[in-house]
Amino acid sequence: MKKIILNLIITVLVCTGFLFISFGQTIVTTKHNLSLTGPGTVKAATESEICKFCHTPHNSLPVRPLWNHTNSGAVYTLYTSSTLNAIPGQPDGSSILCLACHDGTVALGNIVSGPAVTFSGGVTVMPAGTKNISTDLSNDHPISFLYNAALATADGQLVTPAGITPPVHLENSKVQCTSCHDPHKNLYSSFLVTTSQTSALCMSCHSRTYWATSTHKTSVKTWNATAPNPWPHTPYTTVANNACENCHNPHNAGGKLRLLNYAPEENNCLNCHSGTVATSTKNIQTQLAKTYKHNVAGYLGVHDPIENANIITKHVECIDCHNPHAVNATTATAPLAKGFDLGVSGINQSGTNVAAVTNSYEICYKCHTGQTWSSPSAVPRRIVQNNVRLEFATTNPSFHPVVGPRNNAEVALNLIAPNTATTVLYCTACHASDGAGSPAGPHGSTFPQILKLQYATTFGTTESATAYALCYSCHNRTNLLAGTNSFREHSKHVVSAKIPCSECHDPHGISSTQGTATNNSNLINFNSAVVTASGGVIQFIDQGVRRGSCTLICHGKNHNPITY
């Protein structure tokens, strides 16, 4: 009997404001003090008791811990995602208690043990805003799901239940609101049980592959104060300190799938990569405003992280080429993937899907391997091939050295240093943003095909270092036009006749399934719009070192044949 009386006295003392001991902070100084004495704007008009809005020692609901608030009884819309291995159910346990106020359906003063408490300012339910998460939980971190070893194994990027340590905790083996929030203390803002700085709270459960070395984990870049604020829902001022919340929001996320800050996928990247946080060399937003670009703004909700690497539905998003959990500044030599390509899916040279690419070109193969929606070649070719994987194969009669070193020693004689016979190129050697200091990737360009330099393809173009700047960035212009160690009629064609390189040369390569070393060496694959048959024949024949013949009609000139 004495013990019961003592417990009752303690309860009364706590709830009337005389005793508050809670590891350095009490509920008294938090917004969960809904009494007249509370520090927040949402509080009772006259009620001075503090605990009664949630607890009562008598006449409570049959739910621990002595619950005193009327529950909602709502049916909630739950979070779903193709990448979610957990199975969330309707809220239960302590979460249903939190939602009694935070779903905005029940008056804050509706208590079980007595008449409803009147709130000041005419407030009844939780006011609209970030704290009223409504009955739509599809944009909130999932709750009330079983978190066990099987889930951690199935997901592959979760800490095992045994590895989750206080103050983060599971409730009866489930994730609940109280796994992350302590309603009685607000030491870390938002009543979090531990700091969200560097996403320490997230990392209590999540163990993302590659994250340890990601730039998004380590960067100390700050916002330059040019609107909009990239981190409106956090108090932190660097990329590293915001960590997960650079892109994600655990409550009221703008992009429900994967709790992204914004529904348009690219906006979760461009909020920093617009020159306001990332440096000018990583200002992608400027590049995407150019005429020729990977049009990430043209698609919404099409990309799925678990999609087949051999993309079926046409789309492009930043995430198709970059893994934000993995990106870093690691350098590499072609064709190996650099740090900004780590952890991205692709298709290898054998045509096999890979979860994480080894070589950079494997990312490009996801979209540029002859899909039905692939754009035709910018220059119509006698041999038609839209599958760049086949065009770059090192078994081809000729190819640009993207997969491996070139097979033509003659070409190497006219390369500009540091290019040599063994040089391998990235696709971005040609396809990249134009302009000095631009980002390295093929984000956007003023030149067609997202080329980083001008590549004239129009008949009648006056030859100049600028007109064919792309070709001349590797190939020695002086030697080519002089015929030094090269086809000696280059000047006659390109300078005198004003015939562009593209009339004869197919820059990617000619597949061994369609061409031969005799007819298609030196990237010879004629422009079918201007080259017609001579005597029923269109043919180039390689006759040895810098020797060959052409049988065709080109711009009215009959080669029947012409030998050089």
Where are these regions (language model features)?
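C-type cytochrome heme-c attachment and multiheme electron-transfer modules
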Residues: 22-52, 56-564
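Positively charged n-region of N-terminal signal peptides that target proteins for export
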Residues: 1-4
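Bacterial N-terminal signal peptides
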Residues: 9-19
